[in-house]
Amino acid sequence: MRRRRKKSCVISRKKFITKENPQTKPVLQATIEDAYNRLIAPAIEREVRNQLTEKAEDGAIKVFGKNLEQLLMQPPIAGQVVLGWDPAFRTGCKLAVVDATGKVLDTTVVYPTAPTNEKKIAAAKATVKDLIHKYGVTLISVGNGTASRESEQIIVEILKEIPEKVAYVITNEAGASVYSASKLATEEFPNFDVGQRSAASIARRVQDPLAELVKIDPKSIGVGQYQHDMNQKKLGEALGGVVEDCVNKVGVDLNTASASLLEYISGVSKVIAKKHRIIPRGERPFREQKRAPESGKTRTEGV
């Protein structure tokens, strides 16, 4: 860098000192060197660095957007009664059963992972078996966080001991803890604690990944590089656009859609989305477009 600056400074002297004057030449040379080394060169360096940083930032945001789109566009597993399993050690594994429309039917906590004993493991197995039998669970969705593998071992043992045909899947739980502590989750599940909300979210993610993930700030889903190193406004706008494109490309099911999902549909305002949310999930068998709240031709053409 110093060699480059010295070479540039020599070029500058030749450009500005056109006539040799032994009295003024040393002063002009010193002035040019000082101006270039102290002001001009650092300014150029900062500008180049900023341009490179901005270019790298744009590339990182594109990676964020591409990864987010792939996550949102995962195919849903519809028509399943799902047992959401939020694994943990000391605080226990939180369970939530949701029906085919995403309505939470039951929640509980079991302690099959360390520190534990045979008595607690047996009690946990009995609880899970009872939930499967009582609600007709057809799929278990296990979060991939802490104690995921230990929970998987217990689930495999349970499935071998019951006559029901139940499958299980490991689900990416990134952002579930952020959602469970959010204002939206508190409004949706006012009587549930953070763990129960997280288990319900893990269950719903396999039923309709897009509908569940739109409730979480895209920057918190963990689909790219360290997001705090980037321009937050630019990143937020880009990821918001990806979510909007995905929602409008796929459309929504009014029977299971939340207000958060409906807000991304073209022509649906937050007011209309909240009106829809007031209708309980169990009372939403919309089979005709005209039954939807505020359903005009223009209003629901993207739904």
Model-derived segments and their meaning:
Residues 1-81, 100, 125-130, 134:
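Extended, highly charged clamp/arch subdomains and adjacent linkers
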Residues 10-18, 46-55, 135-142, 184-192, ...:
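Short hinge/gating elements
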Residues 37, 41, 73, 156, ...:
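Non-catalytic alpha-helical coupling and interface elements of nucleotide-dependent molecular machines
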Residues 60-72, 78-81, 90-240:
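Phosphate- and other anionic-substrate recognition elements at nucleic-acid/protein interfaces
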Residues 65, 235-250, 272, 280:
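Short, contiguous, well-ordered secondary-structure segments
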Residues 70-74, 130, 134, 212, ...:
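Conserved helix-loop functional segments at active or binding sites
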Residues 249-303:
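Accessory alpha-helical DNA-binding modules that contact the DNA backbone or grooves
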